[in-house]
Amino acid sequence: MTITFRNYRGPEDLDLQNAFWVQATRDLPWCWKPTLSPALYAQGAKFDPRSRCFAFAGDRLVGYMSFTGEGEFVSLGYPWVLPGYEGELQEQLYDAVYDFAASPEYGGKRFAQRFREQWTDQISFFERHGFRAESTGSIYALDLLPAADPQIWVSGEVEVQDKFCWDDFCQVSLGHVTWEQLAVWKQYFETVDFDFAVKARHGASAAGTIGVAIRPDTRFAEMIVVAIAQKATDALVSCLSAAVRHARSRRAKFLGTKPISLDGSVDVLTHMGFKRVSEEFLFSKTI
């Protein structure tokens, strides 16, 4: 059957893209919850319909590729296709989307995407197209089904919140994170569809905060944010314990995290039953 291509037409295509991405990534180990990036980018001043390319066999969507970006930076998506459409169609999607992103008209110069180490098809595709990999750290996960509740007393200074609070993150991070880094984090956190957060207090000040996003279909809960005041290991323990309990109450199957910037954090994770399950790699290319 002949494959036809078209670009973004309207908000309904965001739903189409999201549903296809969820289907395509469901079996990828440790894949995160869909982000808000596509919708936010579509509302931006620099959005162009050519940043999204959809492939159809008749009326059936069989593949798509997209990117989001700001300035010269482009977060370049992978050409997702249904089984049986790998190969040539992926190259066609890549050529259409990447060539536009890298064109003088759009102005992309720096391209990046992240994958987990088990995602061999995605990794090999980006390597073939000139991207270089850099590890951003291990992924640790706790199996919540057999795990017992942490036998750790959780301080009354810890609370579970419905929303992640940016001000708490800033309060914990000030002093060891630059304003430039805070600006980058703020932009990233705005794209995350958080399900709940945990906050630890020392007196009137925030001593730690965790933000969690749960992927509905796989029940993988990922701690996107783990910010703990320096030397506040007790706050980390209390926050993790509360996150474990609340994630289980939300029917999550696994609770995962990237490395935590606190001395002794790996020992804390190991003591609580977390195991290293993957590695995350950032693939980048500059033209």
Where are these regions (language model features)?
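Short amphipathic alpha-helix that is part of the acyltransferase structural core
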Residues: M1-L36, G137, A147-Q181
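Conserved donor-binding loop and adjoining core beta-sheet/short helix segment
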Residues: P11, T25-D95, A101, H202-T233
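A generic structural signal for beta-strand entry/edge sites
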Residues: G71-F73, R110, G137, T218-F220, ...
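Hydrophobic beta-strand segments of well-ordered beta-sheets in folded domains
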Residues: V74, G107-Q113, A221-I224, R251-K258
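Membrane-interface helix-loop-helix junctions at boundaries between adjacent transmembrane segments
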Residues: P83-E86, Y94-A101, G107-F115, W119-E127
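Conserved acyl-CoA
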Residues: Q92-K109, S238-K253
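Active-site/acyl-donor-binding loops of N-acyltransferases
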Residues: R114-Q151, A242, R250-I287
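Intrinsically disordered, low-complexity segments enriched in Gly and acidic/Ser/Thr residues
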Residues: G175-H246, K253
